């Protein structure tokens, strides 16, 4: 049975016959720490780290989407009239899906290529033998996996296939923004009412196509729910860190909205 059929990662070799290099360089099973699954350097194709082919262009487009998101929030009186602390919490909880909707609305496309990963042997040979904790080099910045980026692209393509109009995008953003389930809200009941209003407005936009609009509404809401499963860390690692470094997007949005 092949490794792919048995569920064993091909890059790790057979479970009973590890590679010679792996045997020589690996400590005993009791002392070897488990690598986090999200950051393991698995050589399987779907888990290989990738990076943008055109980071400066894509990052510029991503920042433009953030700017349009801020403009959308500024022009939304129902959001601006909320307590500042509630605005901050809503931003922290929903900036990722709002940003993804902005990418979809602006039809932002991008390509990725495999990121170079130094071999274990190269790392060992280049490491200073007497380097302590103070002289150790900082770890390489995290890179998104191919599988995660492909899922993100699939979600964007699904939204493009729906061919949403500006009003549909606006009201859908409202249903995502006004999330009463965000912890720590002071006006959660009012925010729940705002979310319901945005949902009704979205239904009214689709009403001329009734009864076919019922299926369209279900598809729109289903696709919107998938956006919440895309990690904000992935968005930062892919679109922003390669050019502008480590940045807290929530704080950046707060600065742009003059909430800080």
Curated annotation (Swiss-Prot):
GO biological process, one term: Notch signaling pathway
Keywords linked to the UniProt accession: Biological rhythms, Cytoplasm, Methylation, Nucleus, Receptor, Repressor, Transcription, Transcription regulation
Protein name as catalogued: Nuclear receptor subfamily 0 group B member 2
Modification Symmetric dimethylarginine occurs at: 57
PROSITE patterns cross-referenced by the UniProt entry: NR_LBD (PS51843)
Physiological role: Transcriptional regulator that acts as a negative regulator of receptor-dependent signaling pathways. Specifically inhibits transactivation of the nuclear receptor with which it interacts. Inhibits transcriptional activity of NEUROD1 on E-box-containing promoter by interfering with the coactivation function of the p300/CBP-mediated transcription complex for NEUROD1. Essential component of the liver circadian clock which via its interaction with NR1D1 and RORG regulates NPAS2-mediated hepatic lipid metabolism. Regulates the circadian expression of cytochrome P450 (CYP) enzymes.
Subunit field text: Heterodimer; efficient DNA binding requires dimerization with another bHLH protein. Interacts (via N-terminus) with NEUROD1 (via N-terminus and C-terminus). Interacts with ID2. Interacts with NR1I3 and EID1. Interacts with RARA, RXRA, THRB, NR5A1, NR5A2, PPARA and PPARG. Interacts with RORG, NFIL3, NR1D1 and BHLHE41. Interacts with HNF4A; the resulting heterodimer is transcriptionally inactive. Interacts with DDX3X; this interaction disrupts the interaction between HNF4 and NR0B2/SHP that forms inactive heterodimers and enhances the formation of active HNF4 homodimers.
Keyword Ribosomal protein attributed: no
PANTHER family tied to this protein: NUCLEAR RECEPTOR SUBFAMILY 0 GROUP B (PTHR24081), NUCLEAR RECEPTOR SUBFAMILY 0 GROUP B MEMBER 2 (PTHR24081:SF0)
Post-translational modification (record): Arginine methylation by PRMT5 enhances repression activity of metabolic genes in liver in response to bile acid signaling, by increasing interaction with cofactors.
Organism: Rattus norvegicus (Rat)
Cellular component annotations (GO), alphabetically ordered: chromatin; cytoplasm; nucleoplasm; nucleus; protein-containing complex
Keyword set includes Chloroplast: no
Pfam families for the chain: Hormone_recep (PF00104)
Expressing tissues: Detected in kidney, testis, heart and liver.
UniProt gene name: Nr0b2
One MF term in the entry's GO annotations: protein homodimerization activity
């Amino acid at each position: 049975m092949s490794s792919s059929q048995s569920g064993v990662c091909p890059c790790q070799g057979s479970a009973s016959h590890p590679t010679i290099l792996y045997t020589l360089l690996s400590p005993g099973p009791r002392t070897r720490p488990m690598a986090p699954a999200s950051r393991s350097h698995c050589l399987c194709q779907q888990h290989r780290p990738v990076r943008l082919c055109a980071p400066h262009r894509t990052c510029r487009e991503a920042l433009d989407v953030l700017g349009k998101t801020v403009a959308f929030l500024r022009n939304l009186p129902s959001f601006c009239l909320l307590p500042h602390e509630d605005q901050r919490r809503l931003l922290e909880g929903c900036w990722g899906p709002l940003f993804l909707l902005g990418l979809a609305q602006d039809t932002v496309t991008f390509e990725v290529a495999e990121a170079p990963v130094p071999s274990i042997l190269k790392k060992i040979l280049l490491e200073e033998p007497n380097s302590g904790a103070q002289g150790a080099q900082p770890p390489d910045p995290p890179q998104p996996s191919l599988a995660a980026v492909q899922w993100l692209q699939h979600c964007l393509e699904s939204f493009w296939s729906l061919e949403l109009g500006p009003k549909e995008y606006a009201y859908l953003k409202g249903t995502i923004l006004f999330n009463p389930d965000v912890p720590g809200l002071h006006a959660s009941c009012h925010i729940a009412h705002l979310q319901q209003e945005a949902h009704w407005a979205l239904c009214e936009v689709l009403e001329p196509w009734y009864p076919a609009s019922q299926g369209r509404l279900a598809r729109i809401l289903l696709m919107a729910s998938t956006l919440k499963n895309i990690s904000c860390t992935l968005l930062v690692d892919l679109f922003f860190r390669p050019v502008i470094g480590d940045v807290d997007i929530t704080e950046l949005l707060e600065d742009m909205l003059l909430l800080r």
